[in-house]
Design a protein with these regions (language model features):
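Acidic (Asp/Glu)-rich catalytic clusters
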Residues: 30-36, 81-88, 303-308, 339-343, ...
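Aromatic-lined carbohydrate-binding/catalytic grooves of carbohydrate-active enzymes
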Residues: 33-76, 99-109, 192-202, 300-301, ...
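Boundary/entry segment of secreted carbohydrate-active catalytic domains
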Residues: 2-31, 43
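Aromatic- and glycine-enriched glycan-recognition loops and surfaces
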Residues: 18-34, 58-89, 165-168, 265-269
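Active-site mouth loops of central-metabolism enzymes
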Residues: 13-25, 153-167, 352-353
Length: 640
């Protein structure tokens, strides 16, 4: 069931190139002409540009500006954007929400620009305040918070500071009007524990809007809200509970939620209200950090804000890639499923901090309704270049099989967001492990947030796997019991100590199964044996990840093979995939009265295309894939 979290239509694209450091080489444009991406992410339009654009520092990483001078960079980006428009693509640029590079002691970067004679009034108007320290994150004593990244000192603008937002609005206007950029990806969506007056005033108002003074006292141990001040530890984002903090867990959670809500309000003001007023079809994304299902910049954000009116949800996975030898192949596909669910089925992107598994990285994005390969496009490397061109041409040729689609998943794995909102992140570890089990066993599953449990959503699936019961509401437990009454299995963790009493009524049901976290065999056997009519099965290596989608009169199944010869050598030439063969498929059809007319295997690699031999037995379809290297798509056509 397609979800909606937009005031307008959702955008879709899956041919996407992203570079953080800019590529000024004309050969890059030639590569793009050949690869034909729909969207290119490159360029800087926020505080970074105005901090380093007029200095030699801008030529180094991470910006690698191709020319020097703010006006010169804007002109270069305008020309580049036009070149991409000419070949049918769009360009989205980077925009820092907080960090502005510069050393306050040496008066470099943003400080040199703001404090000196080089402030670009002709672009940004008069300075909104006299001093930078009236724009940025502050310590409780009023001093600026100063950090370091890429060897550069930085300060961070405050999302609750109206003057910082005003400056950002002007930067967005310049980017759109001057450079004709097609969208933005926000960077550094952080709160470093700001305790400025704006944050204190906004946080007090935030609490009063949600709680009575009596509740504020009893829940958060705040006697006098008027005199309460943030202490530099509260509200950090990304962040999590500090068990040694003197503050109650509830206050720590509320402070993080406040920070993340403030960031979203800041984001909406500059990009949606300002940016989309100038360009209604502006493509909007945000670059956040998830690792493997860890705490991130939206971990306690209100549900209704999560990805609202955004198009692209980028989450970096970190540099850890996992190894086949250690039983880790493509586990971060679980991240993509999580993002797709929490965002309301927006475009999920993984920022992979490695440039070796180019084909697998593109393929996993394509297989999860997103654009692949969020970082490190090795366009100068012959193997990397070929991978992008081959896969993009494949996605372009068979675009109709990618979008629009509905999920064909048979099982839902419930993400325990309500537990997180109560300060308990232990169930997330359960979610990670069970998610890996299900992927290894080739169970067709979606992620379902516990906040989205409803009759409509439950009815999409033949089985439900819970990772936490302690934070379920009574109505949710009733819905799950009604679901089990329809002979659908519900799996719950064996250790449910501390769960509300009404959970006992749920677990007493004959179709509710208590399974220990580490009992992988029982988990899979319950799904295969207790789901009426069984589940689809796939006879292939555990290193293959499988997703399936439904279109009108068609089922589309994606296969991504992560198996490879692993070595210490990097680069696309060392991806070294190991082909799989004789993949047996036993697909359960949703309607046994429908007749299959054709089954076709497609791939950007040999054998490219094969018409498969198949056999339909009532609601079961049997076929075999002879061979596949990294990525393959099976298209099953159904008679009307």
């Amino acid at each position: 069931m397609n979800q909606t979290k937009n005031s307008g239509p959702k955008k879709y694209f899956n041919r996407y190139v992203a570079l953080l450091a800019m590529a000024g080489d004309p050969a890059f444009t030639s590569f793009l002409e050949e690869a034909r991406p729909q969207v290119v992410q490159m360029g800087f339009y926020g505080p970074q540009l105005y901090a380093f654009g007029d200095t030699e520092l801008g030529s180094g990483y991470p910006m690698s500006l191709p020319v020097r001078g703010v006006h010169e960079v804007l002109d270069w980006q305008k020309q580049f954007n036009q070149q991409i428009h000419d070949i049918g693509g769009k360009v989205i640029g980077h925009f820092s929400m907080t960090i502005a590079w510069g050393d306050p002691e040496k008066n470099t970067g943003f400080f040199e620009s703001y404090n000196g004679d080089s402030w670009h009034t002709e672009l940004l108007g008069p300075k909104p305040v006299d001093q930078i320290d009236d724009l940025v994150h502050k310590q409780p004593d009023g001093q600026m918070i100063v950090g370091d990244r890429y060897g550069f000192p930085w300060v961070a603008g405050c999302s609750n500071n109206p003057n910082w937002r005003k400056l950002h609005r002007k930067m967005v206007e310049v980017a759109i009007i001057r450079c004709d950029v097609d969208g933005f990806v926000s960077l550094y969506n952080y709160n470093h524990g700001c305790a400025c007056d704006y944050c204190n005033q906004a946080f007090r108002a935030y609490l009063l809007d949600r709680y009575s003074p009596k509740e504020i006292n009893s829940k958060f141990d705040i006697d006098n809200l008027d005199s309460f001040r943030l202490d530099g530890t509260l509200g950090k984002s990304p962040g999590w509970i500090d068990p040694d903090s003197p503050h109650p867990v509830g206050l720590q959670i509320e402070a993080m939620r406040f920070s993340q809500s403030s960031w979203k309000q800041h984001y909406d003001e500059i990009f949606i209200k300002t940016g989309r007023k100038l360009k209604p079809d502006l493509i909007l994304g945000s670059w956040n950090h998830l690792g493997f299902m860890k705490h991130h910049e939206r971990n306690v954000m209100p549900k209704e804000m999560w990805g609202c009116d955004e198009d692209l949800l980028w989450y970096s996975t970190g540099a850890g890639t996992g190894t086949v030898a250690n039983g880790d192949a493509g586990v971060r596909m679980l991240n993509l499923k999580f993002i797709w669910e929490l965002s309301g089925h927006k475009l999920p992107v993984l920022g992979r901090y490695e440039g070796t598994r180019t084909r697998a990285s593109i393929a996993e994005g394509l297989a999860c309704q997103g654009p692949g390969m969020g970082l490190y496009c090795n366009w100068k490397d012959p193997d990397g270049r070929k991978a992008f061109i081959d896969y993009f041409h494949f996605a372009e040729e068979f675009q109709s099989y990618y979008h629009p689609v509905e999920s064909y998943a048979e099982v839902a794995l419930v993400f325990p967001r309500q537990a997180i909102l109560k300060g308990n992140d232990q169930p997330v570890e359960h979610f990670r492990k069970i998610g890996q089990f299900l992927m290894d066993a080739h169970i067709l599953f979606d992620v379902l947030s516990d906040q989205n449990i409803s009759v409509e959503r439950l009815d999409q699936y033949r089985g439900i796997v819970l990772t936490d019961t302690n934070s379920l509401g009574e109505r949710q437990a009733e819905l799950l019991a009604e679901y089990a009454n329809q002979k659908n299995p519900v799996i719950v963790p064996l250790d449910s100590e501390g769960a509300p009493n009404f959970i006992d009524q749920l677990t007493a049901h004959e179709k509710v199964f208590l399974v220990a976290l580490g009992d992988r065999a029982k988990l899979v056997s319950v799904l295969r044996d207790e789901i009426y009519g069984g589940v689809s099965t796939f006879d292939t290596m555990w290193t293959v990840r499988i997703n399936a989608y439904f279109q009108t009169e068609r089922v589309v199944i994606h296969f991504v093979n992560y198996n490879r010869i692993e070595s210490k050598d990097n680069g696309p030439a060392n991806e070294s995939p190991i082909a799989i063969s004789d993949v047996g498929v036993n697909l359960r059809l949703k309607d046994s009265n429908k007749k299959i007319t054709e089954v076709t295997f497609l791939s950007p690699e040999i054998p490219y295309r094969e018409n498969l031999t198949w056999n339909q037995d009532s609601d079961r379809l049997h076929f075999q894939i002879r061979s596949m290297l990294v990525y393959g798509v099976v298209v099953i056509d159904i008679a009307p």
